[in-house]
Amino acid sequence: MMQAMPTIIIYKHYQFFIMRLKAICSVWLFLLLTCCISNNTELNGDSQYQPYAPDGIPFEVSTMAWEADQRGNHRAVVQVSNANDKKAVEVTLPWRRPDLRPDSKRVLVVDGKTDSIVKNVLIKEFSSESAQIVFEPISMDGTYYVYYLPYRFRRGWDDARYGKPWNDYLPPVDEADSLWKAQVNQGNVMKASVCRFESRIRFDAFTPMGLIATEAEEDSLKNIYRQNPIVFPEDRAFPIRLTHNIPVRWAQNGPSDHFHGYALRNEYYTWQIGIWAAHDSVENVKIEFSDLQNGKHIISKSQMTCFNQEGTNWDGQRFESVVNVPKNKVQALWCGVQIPEDVAEGVYKGQIKIHSRKNEVQIIPIQISINAKVLKDKGDGDLWRHARLRWLNSTIGNDSLPVKPFKAMTVKDDEIIATDKTIKLSDNGFPSSIQINGKEILAKPMNLVLSTQNGEVTFNESKLKITQNAAGLITAHAVSENKGFTLESTASIEYDGYIHYKLKLKAPQKTQLNDVRLENTHTAYASKYFMGIGFDGGLRPAKHTWNWEGPWDSYWLGNSKAGLHFEFRGGEYHGPLLNDYRPLPPAAWANGGKGKVVCQGQLNSEAQVIASTGSTTLSPEGNDYEFDLLITPAKPVDTHKHFSERYYHAPHTGFDEAAKEGANIINIHHAQKLNPVINYPFIVQDSLKAFIAHEHQFDRKVKLYYTIRELTNYTTEIFALKSLNHEILASGVGYGIPWLCEHLIDDYKPAWYTELPNETSDAALVLSGFSRWINYYLEGLRWMFENYKLDGIYMDDVSFDRPVMKRMRKIIEKYRPGALIDLHSNTAYSIGPANQYTGFFPYIDRLWFGEHFFYNKMKPDEWFVTFSGIPFGMMSEMLQDGGNRFLGMVYGATARHSYGPYSPAPVWNLWKSFGIEDAQMIGYWEEDCPVQTSDKDVKATVYLKKDKVLVALGNFGNIEKTVKLNFNWEKLGLQQDKVMIKAPVVKDFQNETIFQPGQSIPVKAKEGWLLIIEPKK
């Protein structure tokens, strides 16, 4: 053994020499093919897609896309020459595949002349790096295609969140004839050559950053470069994609001891530092910037950041992240610098220090050559620049100032006024009175009660301090003591009637409590209706008990003019409890299953809600309890606005025709030509802007589907986002459609899928609930207002919370006053959307509730509470199956144009002829509705004008009813003996019918009438 070692060493050196010689030759070919992009000043969004040849074989984008179904996105073009009568040819494919589980996918050989599949195929050697295959050249000489990632193309739409992980790849099959195999084994095989590797379209291309280096190439670099980590500075034009391997570009170019970038004035310039933990894991990686200097001119290091290690969160708070890189893994560190608009042109030099635990500091000199040209938008319009990464740290709209229609707050003694809401506080800091619209919500002051071994303890006396922090924020702080227990209460009261409470409860020593109870008593009026904590919604039951089982953390008690929404807080996630986001309940309130909430009291009497923790232990350090209140309605219902805005919800090509029937607002959904991918409406720009400009000529508005919950794989910054290690992209098992498997590889969670034209697809990823992507999303909204002149957005079940909605509305008022937000939800997905989204309602213009709303099964009180939006200050439209056009008008609701079996246009025509925009809406739910019916299942809503009245009748029962109407003629301003009651003809709704005052009116089950009452002519 000792004698053999020198021979082994010599052999290894020989191998290394040969490998390096091959690599050098490949580098020359690589440089030859990419000479047009060798100068960094010319790098752009096309650079990474230029042909390259890491093994002397070019990787290119095909000049014509082939059919993806059964073939896939990648192929090798193989040339067979001089086959003569050979029954088998052999070809080596250095494909450098990044996908996992390559041996689980079929290798498909297709005859280029006949397009027929070659069945006699034998795989001799196979790995991620390369394969050696033998196949029968059935047409002898010619071109053959080897599809090495074939899959079944998925049609239509689907959702990868549910069920087993998707695997659309074709599995390996052995169809080769045994006699043919025997001939191959006898060696009757000739060589074929690989002309090139092709990607079906540019988006599918692996790029030099997506193909793996071989193990030998990695070992070579490890032998040459002994430092750990090995560092690869990289321009933003070549996003770092891989994490399990280094890319072929790095294997060819090797690491660099410096970085040179090229920027324009006012550009937000980004670049990357690739960290390869080649020899050992790297812990706590930190980048330290220096100033950039050009003589006396300086760009301060304060203008630089590394997005992976620091930033400003969605709530405006600064944070730092710890970056660790496991052994043999790759981590991209994305960096950015704001180039001042007035900076002198020239070359600015500085350095980056790379710190990590247990490793020497590495210093990378950097220089950025700055051109005199000014980039007006900082680079936001050129997605490839990744300038928008700075949006991740934006604080846009984050302040404590009121936004329309809300006003500045005032405070006098213990009374706080938030626009039309008045809150009075007890000495202990809890509300003693909440009034809105002349209605009192609380029958008694709210209070906290401790049940101890020695009886009950309440907190009444304290030192209350109320401070106006800003025009839109008032805080109230109180400390109460009783029998040795201390209660510290801090309330943040905002301009829209939102109140956030933080309570800290302490004992002088560790003390066992029987219970901690928060008690609220609501007036009879303000507790008629109820929803939340496991109750779907409607008239309040005499008693409802909830023990924290199920995805709920809030409830609402109220009526049309006064109500209160209550949310238990204490966890990290405070957005709507969607199927994607079901955090554990707040620990202090749920108390390991011992907590419960009880709502009790006979209908039309006071209602008491008691949140009880059950037995718990109190310590000198204290227990924390949090909750939110929101006074409803958040704002007055604007019926004029509602009836003057009529929605079309279908492909944009039909909008002009729908406008002839009254539609004046379009929502452009995703998966449409002008908005093809989900939640990233930045790819199609020119045609979208042209469409918006066209509609503006006719005073029509254009809104886009734009939300947060999932994000398309077409996002330009997707690899930068993945480098943030689940801050933004949720963790998961991977899989999903082939593109995700081939480019993101693993460690992501697939979501919504939509087929796009030409066998392409939009494959979304689930996002983490709260992250800096919210900041990006809001800046994207601002950008669309400024660049598209967009008129608003359509939100579909989102995962952010009320503070984000505040920021959104402030952005609207600053950059596009009058822009609109409408919210759609799926009651099977968000489990009671009206309750889940109550905190959004001060800032929403309209609801579209919604999917899985089964209108014909809902009682009137369910319609009112869960659908109408009216108790919260807005109105809604019907979605599921077009809703019920008869019952909907009781709440002022129709379906949207082109969404449902019946057009709303005939009802819109009646609105127009009657002038409903200027009418006062008085629903059956109001105490003074001037038209009543004789049957509890038949409801009447009045649209009152000075000289005439429109009455919407709806029979919510399951059988036909005959009813009489009882009129308050004085309030209607009409005389009974001088009026006529007419049901005008409305297509698909009713035929013309005349009724006399006092006459019985038949109303079919689940149908109704639209009656106009006016003086006889």
Task: For each feature predicted by the language model, list its residue ranges.
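Alpha-mannosidase-like glycoside hydrolase catalytic domains involved in N-glycan trimming
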Residues: 43-226, 231-249, 255, 260-343
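Carbohydrate-binding surface patches
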Residues: 60-97, 564-566, 932-974
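C-terminal beta-strand-rich structural cap/linker in extracellular carbohydrate-active enzymes
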Residues: 139-152, 992-1017
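An acidic-aromatic substrate-binding cleft motif
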Residues: 162-189, 367-430, 626-681, 685, ...
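Beta-strand/loop-rich accessory regions of lumenal/periplasmic or secreted enzymes
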Residues: 183-199, 315-324, 334-341, 372-622, ...
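Conserved structural scaffold segments of CAZyme catalytic domains across common CAZy folds
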Residues: 362-364, 471-474, 558-726, 903-909, ...
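Active-site-proximal substrate-binding groove within the catalytic cores of carbohydrate-active enzymes
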Residues: 620-621, 809-812, 816-983, 1007-1010
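Active-site-adjacent "subsite" loops/lids of carbohydrate-active enzymes
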Residues: 704, 708-783, 788
